[in-house]
Amino acid sequence: ISSQSYCSFDPLIFDEYDLKTYNRGRQQQTMNYTYYYIKDALDVCDIDVVVLEVFGMFYEEDDTGFISEGVRDSSLNDMRMSETKIEAIRECVPEEMQISYFFPLDKYHFRWEELDYASWNGFYNSALKPYYEEADRGYKRWTESEVCVDDYWSIAFSEIRRDVYAGNIKYLDKIYELCQKKGAKLILVKAPLPCYDRVIEETNTVSDWAEEHDIELINYMRLQDVLELNFYTDSLDGGTHLNESGAGKVSKHLAAYLKENYFE
């Protein structure tokens, strides 16, 4: 869950395998918000498998994702109003700012004259419907491409480990326990991009956690050949995110794998 999720997994392709999915990634989404997004989904849906893209594990304690108002807004404003959202606000938002997330009109009162039907309809959807309605069920369908010139393949198999922020491990533990309680299978995935030293080394550390908890981690950084990724055409921005072409390759592989191993 993060922009890596909404750039990598296309629910329409999963539909072709009779797998009904929803992509709940948000920009720079940190693991604390991710936990509450998963909790919210499990509260209202009967979910068999939770696929967690692990890039959110690599944010450090002082990264902007933990303190940015923009990240808070994109993570919380699209959550339906519920006990889980209230818990998320109390846990993730500084106390002096919480009122504006409990009552959004407090935050936006100065622009009340600009409110129109779309504003109220959006509030209705987020507050009263189980899921906020989005085109492509949360996936971002970007077709632009920028050539990726770095040789990622040569370093993807490094076995070096790097410490992961303990707060992220805490929420990964909570996600694991929540899925166990709800009877949902947790599967970890690392998208093929980005793929550089720090990400590879921290993915190895998360892989150790997964092995200790008997959880599968599919590391697509090491499956670039299987996916037949083309770094001239499959990256949106020169090596950080996939575009529609690259996401199609990942989605087809993951959907086929899930279908064969968990839904036959």
What is each model feature region?
Residues Q28-N32, R162-N168, P194-E202:
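Acidic-and-aromatic substrate-binding clefts and catalytic sites of carbohydrate-active enzymes
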Residues I1-S3, R24-Q27, E53-F55, V189-L193, ...:
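Active-site-proximal beta-strand/loop segments in catalytic clefts of secreted hydrolases
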Residues T21-Q28, I160-V164, G239:
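Acidic/histidine-rich helix-loop elements
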Residues I200-E264:
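C-terminal regions of proteins
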Residues Y17-K20, D46-V49, Q180-I187, H213-E216:
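Loop/turn elements at helix/coil->beta-strand transitions in domains of secreted/extracellular proteins
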Residues Q4-E87:
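Membrane-embedded segments
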Residues Y36-K39, I169-I175, E201-N204:
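Alpha-helical scaffolding within the catalytic cores
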Residues S68-K182:
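Secreted/periplasmic serine-hydrolase-like ester/acetyl group-modifying domain
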